[in-house]
Curated annotation (Swiss-Prot):
It is an enzyme of class 2 (transferase). The active site is at E269 (proton acceptor), K330, C382 (nucleophile). One of its GO terms (molecular function) is N-acyltransferase activity. This is Apolipoprotein N-acyltransferase. One of its GO terms (biological process) is lipoprotein biosynthetic process. It is a multi-pass membrane protein. Catalyzes the phospholipid dependent N-acylation of the N-terminal cysteine of apolipoprotein, the last step in lipoprotein maturation. Its main location: membrane. HAMAP family: Lnt. The gene is lnt. Pfam families: CN_hydrolase, LNT_N. It is found in: Cell inner membrane.
Length: 511
């Protein structure tokens, strides 16, 4: 087995396969032990490698993880971006090769500055800290790509009880720590005290997760709200067709009008496929309908802002009519889907760079939440729900979470189910109910433990009815966010860095 930790292709190919295990630990497969196995193989494969070899070992791991785990990007480019098979494949390979460096650079840093092969416990802790730092960096760099976090594998796993304490971050940290400790345990057997401490570090977090699973961190803030969510199942090729606007508006109106005994009616992202000011008459009429039902109607709609120079800016928005108020403008935009980086260079090259409604502006920070039926509703439009810290900031001010999306871009791939799993994790982190309304699935209601209690199957038009309970109180994660865990990771990385620089006789303090 020593070949695993040696430079060269055998180890690189194993790293590629180990990375490809990542999506199997997540939705829709949910074989969560594979997250530990995947990271353990990477950790073992980096042992003893020099910096350059470690960089490529990490790159191959990342190529496997993103190549298998974000294969839905090919669907978006080919099926909806009108790119040919060769071009879509080339763009997908280029994207995967680029994001694989998210793992390559930390692997190089690990080999050059942090790894201490003679200190099994300290090495495992530092590796887990570096893994956490990597996931944090991925959520921020170039607007972020916080996909395929190891911690999502624990949505309903043994570590689910730790998620309200430290978010998906804590789950990822424990998984990485467990992977490294399992690799290092054989080296601890001759040392009784170190072995005991290693077992405590390995088993303690899992025991704590099981103990806290199901603990109620929040409590009811009022009577249940009766919810109706509409899943229109509009084909993407019809979505922005001007000739189909009236049919879409009529569809959502006709599905909503018969609904009785309802507090909230929710439509998906851009369910109203024309600008808010152009749809003012329609929205006003639907607001009157909602008022007559003593309900609030919440819908996705693009919003235009006219500027002083006569130009306009466009936003992806959510608005409330009826017994509620507020319009929210999306802050976290999808590259190429909602805006085009370097658009002066890329616009017009291929159809993928000229998708409909791909010129949105970013909404301002610190927007007020939506209000409906007397409660504060935290809104997340599509991609925004995958950002843990961003979502937590809004959730802490709210009693109910709401996410609207159009996952038609993913086709029949695993993308929509990965997206749903991340939404479920936001509910678990915050201890709040979440309403999820999508164009073609999965529309559902999620309880404060991240469980789906009602849903409409994908690719079907349907009406979901159910209840959500407004919640109050803050989970530890909403109170303190990632900062305590990030501080711990910083200390562990500094500890490893200092331990690496000391003379051998001084390293015992840091081992």
């Amino acid at each position: 087995m020593r070949w695993i930790s040696r430079p060269g292709w055998p180890g690189h190919l194993l790293a590629l396969a180990a990375g490809a295990l990542t999506p199997l630990a997540l939705a829709p497969f949910d074989y969560w032990p594979l997250a530990i196995l995947s990271i353990a193989l990477l950790y073992l494969g980096l042992r003893g490698l020099p910096g350059k070899s470690a960089l490529w070992r990490g790159w191959w791991y990342g190529f496997g993880a993103f190549g298998a785990g974000t294969s839905w990007i090919y669907v978006s480019i080919h099926d909806y971006g009108a790119a040919s098979v060769p071009l879509a494949s080339l763009l997908m390979l280029g994207f995967t090769a680029g994001v694989a460096f998210f793992f390559a650079l930390p692997a190089w840093l690990w080999a050059r500055c942090l790894r201490r092969d003679n200190a099994p416990l300290g090495d495992a802790l530092a590796f887990a800290a570096l893994w956490l730092a990597l996931e944090l960096f991925r959520s921020w760099f170039l607007t972020g790509f916080p996909w395929l976090y190891a911690g999502y594998s624990q949505l309903q796993g043994p570590l689910a009880g730790l998620v309200p304490v430290g978010g998906v971050w804590l789950s990822s940290f424990v998984i990485a720590l467990s992977a490294a400790l399992l690799v290092n345990l054989p080296r601890l057997f001759p040392h009784g005290a170190s072995l005991l401490l290693g077992l405590v570090l390995l088993l303690g977090p899992w025991a704590a997760g099981l103990y806290l699973k199901g603990h109620a961190w929040t409590h009811s803030a009022g009577e249940p709200l009766r919810v109706v969510a509409i899943q229109g199942n509009i084909a993407q090729e019809l979505k922005w067709d001007p000739n189909q606007v009236r049919a879409q508006l009529d569809l959502y109106r006709d599905l909503s009008l018969p609904q009785q005994d309802v507090d909230l009616i929710v439509w998906p992202e851009t369910a109203v496929p024309i600008l808010q000011d152009m749809a003012s008459g329609y929205l006003g009429a639907m607001g009157q309908v909602a008022d007559e039902k003593n309900a609030a109607l919440i819908t996705g709609v693009p919003v235009r802002e006219r500027l002083a120079d006569g130009k306009s800016r466009y936003f992806n928005g959510i608005t409330v009519v009826g017994e509620g108020a507020g319009t929210y403008l999306k802050q976290k935009l999808v590259p190429f889907g909602e805006y085009v980086p370097l658009q002066d260079l890329l616009r017009g090259l291929i159809a993928f760079f000229d998708l409909p409604m791909s010129d949105f502006a970013r909404g301002p920070a610190d927007q007020p939440l939506l209000k409906a039926k007397g409660y504060q509703i935290a809104p997340y439009i599509c991609y925004e729900v995958v950002y843990p810290e961003f979502a937590a900031a809004l959730a802490a001010q709210s009693q109910v979470l709401l996410t609207v999306s159009n996952d038609t871009w993913f086709g029949t791939s695993i993308g929509p189910l990965q997206h749903l799993q991340m939404a479920q994790m936001r509910a678990l982190e915050s201890g709040r109910w979440m309403i999820r309304a999508t164009n073609n699935g999965v529309t559902g209601l999620i309880d404060p433990y991240g469980r789906i209690v009602r849903q409409i199957p994908q690719f079907q038009q349907g009406i979901l009815r159910g209840e959500v309970i407004p919640m109050q109180g803050l989970t530890p994660y909403l109170q303190y966010r990632v900062w305590p865990l990030a501080g711990l990771a910083g200390v562990l990385l500094l500890w490893a860095l200092l331990g690496r620089q000391l003379r051998p006789q001084e390293r015992r303090l840091f081992g």
